[in-house]
Amino acid sequence: MRFVFCTATAMLVACLSNYRLPGVVAADQAEKSAAGQVAQPAGAVTIENETVRIVLGEDGRCKSLLEKATGRQWLRPSPGHFFYLKKQGKLFAGTKLASDGDKLVVHFADSGLGAVYRLTVRPRYFIVGLEQIDGDGAGEVEEIGLGRLEPAIDENIGWWLSVRWNEQFACCALGLSDRVNTSNVGAIVYRQFGMTGQQAAFVAVPTKDLLDVIEQIQRECNLPSPRIGGQWAKRCEDVRRGYLFVDMTEQNVDEAIRYAKLGHFGYIMTYDGTWASSLGSYPINLKNFPRGEESLKATIDKCHAAGLKVGMHMLTSFVGKNDPLVRPKPDPRLLKDAEAVLAADIDAQVQEIPSATPLDQFPLSPAFYGDERQGLDILIDDEIIHYRQIDHQGRKFLRCVRGFAGTTAAPHKAGAKIHHLVERYGCYLVDLRTSLKDELAELIAGVFNRCGFDMIYFDGGECNAANGPYWYWVSQQQMAIYNRIRRDILVQGSGGTPWTWHIFARGACDDFAAVAVKQYLDYHKIADSWMHYTRSFMPAELGWWGFFDDQPNHPATTPDEVEYYAIRMIALDTPVSLETTMAALKRHGRTDELLELLGRYERLRLSGEVPPEVRKRLRQGEWHLVDGPRREFRPVRYDTHRLTQPGALTVGNSSARQPLRFRLQAVPGLAQPGDGANIVLLRADSPLELPPPQPNSPMPGAMAASVDLTQLAGGTGGTGGAVGAGAGVQKAASGKPVSLVKHRGLAVRLRVEQPLPAAGPCAVLNVQLEASNKTYRDHYIDLDFTGEKVVILPEPTTERMLPEFRPAHANYAFKAAMYSNFHYQNISALNFRWMRTTQPLPRCTILSVEALAESDSRLENPTITCGNQKLLIPATLNTGDIADCSQPRMIKLFDRNWNLQKTVTAEPADGAPQLAPGDNQLHLEWTGRGAARLTIITLGDDALPIDGAN
């Protein structure tokens, strides 16, 4: 290694001519590299090691970033300054740089400030440490940079690890303590966390070597570096195995082990609410583990004996409202984020609480999805009070619930402090500046160590940003727990920081979706989460993926959804974790079969038999693994149609002639618009003309209008009056949500005026149901017509959202429109949103909206006609029942949860209908009433053989 420098002044040259360090030479004495002599400006400082030569100019800008092995120049054109600082909100670049032995002396523009950095060069990285800041106002410096590399690399930019890389080269910045923030290959320190003495390591190496160098830095600089079985956690075999995330207890552990074995999972992780009875104190849940820790340890021991490891799920720093830290007396170390002063004495019954100070910092919304300031709970002395409103003057809490969350209502004196309790996802948080952080860490680590857990999932970690800057505070509780664990540990969680990158073994690709699961996997889990992780050199797994039984807000998991995940698992050579409940696994009739399918794919992935070129093809489209003498993947397509009688559809077959394969399900029939059993959400005498989005409105998803459904008559529907006529959102003042459990389909009568666009896609309107917990279901209408029309929306069309018009987060979180906690029995609003606009935008008026009454369907002897061939199913399908024909003429009949009822042979017996190449006209008819969902399954000819197959 070498640190090559050239002094900035003749005086420094004279001084340094008599001060030589091993491996340090003057710039004019530098040897030629493989690329030849580097032209260096006068006064340059050169940093050189085995992999890279970096030249910093006297003006503080980087002049060269040369890869020595190839002679390639990686520096971005017109780079900025290597150092900077911020004082009183103003940025000052490091515009003058000189070297003094192993120190760099930097002056910052006209700030009157300078800094001294110590430079340490290692064979494959170098370290920059801040030694001092000098000059008038040095104590007013808010932040200062430790350096920034600016490679001309844009292919991959890490968000968690501060790295830029492509297939050839990588540049990375690593803080050497949790008080150093890194981003975009730069490092920053801040006054509030301490600046002098902090260090950052910079790496510029061939990409294939980056992880080796980072592991070396962890070892040489005493950074966290967890190991599993003697291997670095990020590269250990356990990281390649998935896990079953389920409510495992001492009573059901044998069944949980059986399920995990079927899916070939390496771990079972149990929910926080399963092993503990509340968040915060985390008392062992004696219902599930009757002997406390003894039961929990026995359960884990049984998993270990079966060859499985066990993960602990927790919500990082969350404190449940049912926890001893809250009731009967709240712990003073709960996090608070707003303060007011009680204006007058109050007794224990009063429901209006006056404040002597403004309440503009107190939220107006409950704690639902997201990380914004929210929650309606305040603390006065030892009483928690829940408020529902704040008066228009912003000086009084209204409609208060006294003695909330198990506390005791009590009188309070004027002048008492009113604190807002920070709330996320219905829980309070620990104030991480207090001793409660370490108490919680001791508690969790103690259970982990004593009971023999192998993995921890720090869920909800991102919410700790409520304490302060995300990059620092999100790591604090996680690290406090990690540092106390005395076992090999696989760490995952949500909320990553530069410091926790070191302890995390991999990342999970976000929560599961209950609807549009295939699109959610491709357009979010893979395109967003998996790419974000891998761009930061973090291994990833495709969980969490939900496994469902049938519910009003989502169907039961289907075989093609399982295979879709399994295919992507092989394509990306990435494991998957399955989140579900034991109850859902038991209710679903094909659980064993589908877990075995997943396990078969997992074994194939782990075997490494699928060649890279095949895996690359499997990243797109749907595929089916065909076992037999020749194992191969074949393209598969699922075309789904909702039909009433007479039901006709056209099915395309782009492949050779093949047997008709299908899935037929009886679905609820829907009443006609105007039927007295419907629930009127917007009456015809209250039309809504939808205004266009404002020019600066985020798109897609800009709100055009909203109808408050809690103000329907009695909140029960019927012919209730319309509200919300005109533009804008109207908030509820009273009333109850509407139940649409038996009215899930919508009929929208609307009028579209003005010319349609001459070319290109049409405008798209979202008729959105909003539940009282701020979750949604989207229904899209293409405005590709003019005049008046009734559009029937039998079910949500969420599968279009991510491929076509992902909503701007400022409008609504797309995940809130896909999660399973949407409840049709608690619908509070009907929203109209613009998902796509055109020029000119058609004039659109909503004339009425009805929620259509559902009725039971009965499909007797359903018959499918294809050309001149017929297939009759000799059975009756009631609502939810499924007829599955994956093999010619063999029909398996299931209930809505895929429990097998019986197997029948389709008629006639002389052969099954065939799909000819090209378009095929199909007709579906039956005796009885109702509607059907018909899915036609076609296999393609473009097979992908697996090398090594017999």
Language-model segments: residues:
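Carbohydrate-recognition beta-sandwich/jelly-roll modules
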Residues: I47-I268, D272, P290, A298, ...
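Extracellular beta-strand ligand-recognition surfaces/modules
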Residues: I144-G147, L660-F662, G674-V680, H743-V748, ...
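Aromatic-lined carbohydrate-binding/catalytic grooves of carbohydrate-active enzymes
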Residues: E237, G242-E339, V422-A441, A445, ...
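Carbohydrate-binding surfaces of carbohydrate-active enzymes
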Residues: L296-G320, L334-E339, R568, L572-D675
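Autoprocessing Asn-cyclization modules and mimics
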Residues: T316, G320-R402, G406-A409, G669-A671
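Glycan-recognition surfaces
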Residues: L325-E339, Y425-E439, Y482-L585
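Intrinsically disordered, low-complexity segments enriched in serine, threonine, and glycine
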Residues: L364, R402-A405, A410, A414, ...
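Extracellular ligand-binding interfaces
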Residues: L681, P687-L690, Q694-G715, G721-A816, ...
